[in-house]
Amino acid sequence: MFEEYERLRSLFESRNAPAAIKLFRAKSAPLILFFLRREFKQTPVGFVPHTELVRRLASVLDKISFRDYIEEDDNDLQQVLDSSEKAELLIRKWSDQGFITFEPDEKGMYQHSLTSHSEKVLQWMDSLRKEDF
């Protein structure tokens, strides 16, 4: 009877959870969702160059209280004071977690795009907004 509950609990607690679930579980989910929507959806673009995405995230970090979003066990982010360095670490972390891609273009310059997991999460969030109003 509680098999479905156990399956869901296991899914949410697993280190191998799908990227969409990792995104919802992240302490920094509001920041991630805000930033990804802003950079990839407000003006639809396929790819954003790595250096540009880092620069834009650093600008956002300068305007918010980012320390509220740092996970307790994230020593790298706790030790970095500069917003550009934090942005670089976050972009790489988001790529490692499957929220965005990190791949070279035809010239060998690295760029990012949304993964299908993040696309679906943003679509779902949009559907919630439409129902709220």
Task: Locate the predicted segments by residue.
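Non-transmembrane, amphipathic alpha-helical segments
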Residues: 20-24, 45, 86, 113
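Intrinsically disordered, low-complexity serine/threonine- and proline-rich regulatory segments
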Residues: 1-31
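Alpha-helix N-cap/helix-initiation sites
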Residues: 25, 46-50, 80-84
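Extended assembly-interface/linker segments at domain junctions
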Residues: 55-59, 63-133
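Positively charged, polyanion-binding regions of nucleic-acid-associated proteins
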Residues: 26-47
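Preference for short coil/turn "hinge" residues that link or interrupt alpha-helices
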Residues: 16-17, 40-41, 93
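Short, charged, low-complexity loops and linkers
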Residues: 11-15, 35-39, 129-133
